[in-house]
Amino acid sequence: MSPKRVLLAALALLGIGVLMVGGAGWWAVDHYTGKVDRIAGAFPTHVPPAQQPAPSKGGQTFLLVGVDSRSDLPTTGRDAKAPSWRYGAQRSDTMMLVHLPADHSNAYVVSLPRDSWVDIPGHGTAKLNAAFSWGGPPLLIDTVQRLTDVRVDHLAIIDWEGFKELTDAVGGVDLRVDGTVRHMNGTEALVYVRERKNLPRGDFDRTHRQQNFLRAVLTRTMTTRNLTNPVRAAELLDTLTASVSVDDRLSDADLRELLWDNRSVRPGDMVFMNAPVARTDTVKGQSVVLLDRAKSEALWAAMRNDTLADYVASHRTDRLGSGTR
């Protein structure tokens, strides 16, 4: 049996679209937003509104998900050839909450460890990534909202095939490995983000690699070759819209407005961090991550109140540095 494929959510549709508004032209964004695949019934409508988090006091929060589809066929985007979710067939191996503040000054990316030991509605306690396997997008969103008390405004999902396509679409990425910068194509970058056993902190370092990759994709997109060449820009947007699926509440008009409002955000304005962790443990024979509830609540409160800039300035966080590893 082949090793379990670990998938990075390269979910850069929003970020890359923002970067391309100024370079490729608004016409391209307007044209391609209509091609984005929509996921029907992504939200937990079975949960009464009174039991769901209140809207944030400013900005919007997205849940970005990378899934291990265990399929040789693409499962997300308009080119999908297999279902995006079947019971027990997929796990969300990468989950990031992305908060875009009301002042459009930054983007805050918070990774949720896939092995976080959490309450999953209707299933008791289990690893966070099991929620998608058992109940698809609605159960995962419900679980994340109950964990954080943060309203998830929108969802974006990409699978393994989409990850590789996205990397190759931007012309590959530059990542630092053992002190040397290497240029990687989609297949090579997948190996980079899958690595765990040979990293000092295992899954925690792999999470940083996932964040490094996302930043590298955005940086690569900013190259003159991608931004000033209409053909290259069109090819890139075509690949993005073919690979990524979003919830059906995110209309074409919403997406265009979102991209326009955040058009000045650049890779250097993105703040990457991890949800605070108390420790690792073994529960029911499984290696799990126990989140630090007190420290996590301060982070989630800042996200709810749209005050993440103040939070980052006053808290020591497990943040991604300026280099790569």
Give the location of each predicted region.
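Second-shell loop/turn segments in exported
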Residues: P83-R86, A126-W134, D149-H154, K197-D205, ...
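N-terminal post-signal-peptidase region of extra-cytosolic proteins
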Residues: F43-Q51, P74-M96, A130-Q145, R151-V152, ...
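N-terminal hydrophobic targeting segments that direct proteins to the cell envelope
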Residues: P3-Q90
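C-terminal solvent-exposed extensions
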Residues: D72-L73, G77, M184, S245-R325
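Flexible, polar/acidic helix-loop-strand segments at domain edges
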Residues: Q60, G162-T239, V244, T324-R325
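Sec-exported extracytoplasmic/periplasmic mature domains
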Residues: H99-A102, W117, S133, Q145-D149, ...
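Extracytoplasmic
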Residues: K57-Q60, Q90-M95, H104-L112, H123-T125, ...
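Amphipathic, coiled-coil-like alpha-helical scaffolding segments used for oligomerization/assembly
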Residues: L128-V181, R249
